[in-house]
Amino acid sequence: ATSAVLKGMDNLNDQIVMIATTNLFDSFDKALLRRFDACIDFNRYSREDLHDIAEIVLRDFLNKFKHTGRNVRLFNKILDEFNNIPYPGELKNLIKSSIAFSKPDDEFDYLKRLYTAVTNTPNPDVKELQAKGYTVREIEILSGISKSHVSRLLQEV
């Protein structure tokens, strides 16, 4: 199939301008890329840009799902767990699925689900969370353990 596409591109009329877009640029065959006169990378987001975009996406989804609570500070701490924050499309899907599959009777369950998705840690250790700079209240949200119990666990040495 690739060779047929390459042959077709080689035989295009010179009067035709072909423009293509993809978010899978790294997966393309180099021979295919050589057929284009220019390749432009639009992924020039800074980490701060991605945080801003994520907050906008979060706000939009929280407005649609009335059972959710807002904790943008914790949301941003969770985003900081990423070495590389995903680009907007993937970020939107991650946020949407965390909210959509959250427990309706737990207003911050989406944050726990988001943390699990980002860190691949379904049951985070309270001491590790504290070492990462999470507050007792944030640890309560992420671990599901009451604040008083979290405090006792953190006081144990």
Where does each model-flagged region fall?
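C-terminal alpha-helical "lid" subdomain
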Residues: 48, 52-157
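Conserved catalytic/switch belt of AAA+ P-loop NTPases
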Residues: 1-34, 38-43
